[in-house]
Regions:
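C-terminal membrane-cytosol helix-exit motif in multi-pass small-molecule transporters
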Residues: 1-10, 205-206
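Juxtamembrane intracellular "pre-TM" segments in multi-pass secondary transporters
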Residues: 6-36
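Pair of pore-lining "gating" transmembrane helices in MFS-fold secondary transporters
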Residues: 29-48, 131
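Short amphipathic helix-loop junctions that connect adjacent transmembrane helices
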Residues: 51-66
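A membrane-interface helix-boundary motif in multi-pass transporters
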Residues: 64, 178-198
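Helix-to-loop junctions at the C-terminal end of transmembrane segments
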Residues: 82-95, 182
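C-terminal transmembrane helical hairpin of 12-TM major facilitator-type secondary transporters
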Residues: 97-141
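A late C-terminal transmembrane helix in Major Facilitator Superfamily
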Residues: 145, 149-184
Length: 212
């Protein structure tokens, strides 16, 4: 079955340079930066985890490739469940409140992981709570995306593209820092504290977002 979804964007830029000229307007807008920060931070957790997670699995828990693969699948499951929840409650909760809720849940994940790992040394103590963290991220992404494109409505396309670029850059930088420092610190503590820091920053940026 084929359905023609007609074009809905009629204010197209003449060329790429015309689009780039709109970036200063976005870059100087707090309404753009706050949801973009939340969006980028909620994505950077994957950069941290997918560098730190395998290191912890091999160096700390000495897991087999099969078990490590199972443990590394938890983030995907959490993210999907978060997306499903958003689709059910988006009509009754504002996008800003969804961002705040997601940030709180994201923050709780590594806190629980850190607590359990220090009291009970087991792979699931570290990896299972990560599902909670990505569940929060799954709530944040759709909500923050909506806020980004609403920041300056006539620049929605530019905002979406620039926001995604910032998200990718921040995630890459987080992964870079993880790769540098994890070898010199306690791997579990470092990953958890780094993720907790991201959760705190995500919470404050979502809390300060001025929803339109």
């Amino acid at each position: 079955i084929m359905i023609d979804l007609k074009e809905t964007h009629f204010q197209k830029s003449k060329d790429i340079f015309s689009q780039i000229k709109t970036y200063p307007t976005l870059i100087t807008s707090l309404n753009f930066w706050l949801p973009t920060s939340t969006f980028a931070l909620s994505f950077s957790i994957f950069g941290i985890f997918f560098i730190g997670g395998p290191y912890v699995a091999v160096k700390v828990f000495n897991l087999s490739p099969t078990i490590m693969g199972i443990c590394l699948s938890f983030p995907a499951l959490g993210y999907v469940l978060g997306n499903i929840l958003v689709s059910k409650i988006a009509n009754i909760i504002s996008t800003k409140n969804l961002m705040v809720l997601g940030s709180v849940i994201l923050f709780l994940g590594p806190c629980i992981s850190l607590l359990l790992s220090n009291f009970y040394f087991h792979p699931l103590s570290f990896f299972l709570p990560i599902l909670i963290m990505t569940f929060g991220s799954g709530i944040i992404w759709p909500a923050s995306n909506a806020e980004i494109v609403k920041a300056i409505p006539h620049l929605a396309g530019s905002a979406s593209g620039l926001g995604s670029a910032i998200m990718t850059l921040m995630s890459s930088f987080a992964a870079f820092l993880t790769g540098i420092y994890i070898e010199y610190l306690n791997p579990i503590d470092f990953v958890c504290y780094f993720l907790i820091l991201v959760g705190v920053l995500s919470f404050f940026s979502s809390l300060c977002t001025r929803s339109k």
